[in-house]
């Protein structure tokens, strides 16, 4: 009888992100996942020579950015605190870098600026 290995959803999502990155669909990825998979995620990226930056999110989750070195250099300067504390400008830049819909990013930026009264 063949024994099947169950791959956690977090790891399936990571593998899909890596696939898209390697195919050129994305230049940078932000993946938020349970801290228990940190070693597996890092081993997977390092085995494929993919650069990354990792940041804690609360006590049990991590933000894993990976992709092109020039993008990660910018991330190291922009994402220096929790994402919900980014300025509207930093939030906009991060969304654009991640390839989010630019019109939606513009709308989000304007809403955040209006909320801050800036």
Predicted regions and their residues:
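Domain-length accessory/inserted modules outside core catalytic folds
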Residues: 1-118
């Amino acid at each position: 009888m063949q024994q099947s290995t169950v791959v956690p959803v977090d790891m399936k999502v990571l593998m899909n992100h890596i696939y898209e990155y390697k195919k050129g669909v994305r230049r940078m990825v932000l993946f938020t996942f349970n801290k228990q998979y940190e070693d597996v995620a890092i081993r997977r990226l390092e085995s494929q020579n993919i650069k990354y930056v990792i940041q804690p999110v609360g006590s049990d989750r991590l933000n894993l950015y990976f992709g092109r070195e020039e993008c990660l250099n910018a991330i190291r300067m922009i994402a220096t605190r929790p994402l919900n504390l980014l300025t509207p400008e930093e939030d906009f830049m991060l969304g654009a870098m991640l390839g989010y819909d630019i019109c939606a990013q513009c709308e989000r930026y304007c809403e955040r600026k209006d909320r801050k009264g800036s």
